[in-house]
Amino acid sequence: MPWKELPVTDPIRLTGLLTGGWDKLAFQPFAEGVEIYPILEGEPALALLKYEPGAAVPRHLHTGLETICVLSGSQSDEHGTYQTGTVIANPEGTSHEVWSDDGCIVLIQWN
């Protein structure tokens, strides 16, 4: 395999995510009661999602891997409720509806 020059870019750093550092970030509307802070666009994409209490994202099909880390609060789907510190991996071909009864912040990666 020939060597390929890749463009040089600086890494993206977000500090304090385990201690509420998202409070200073400018989230944007995503779905009713859910806001997004895009970190990396394209594939894979990376973002923070902020769910207000009672907010939900309708059922959707994953066309690639989706990985979620719950940073604060709890998030639920039909398979269970995931507390702070939980990592959920949803492989390609899976689907679910997601909600948060009490509100949460998640770090999410998807392809």
What role is predicted for each listed range?
Residues 52-55, 62-77, 84:
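Glycine- and acidic-residue-biased ligand/ion/polar-headgroup-sensing regions
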Residues 56, 86-87, 105:
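Residue-level marker of beta-strand positions
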Residues 1-43:
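A short, N-terminal "cap"/entry segment at the start of jelly-roll beta-barrel domains
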Residues 92-111:
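Ligand-binding loop in jelly-roll beta-barrel domains
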Residues 38-40, 48-50, 58-62, 79-80, ...:
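Short histidine-centered beta-strand/loop micro-motifs
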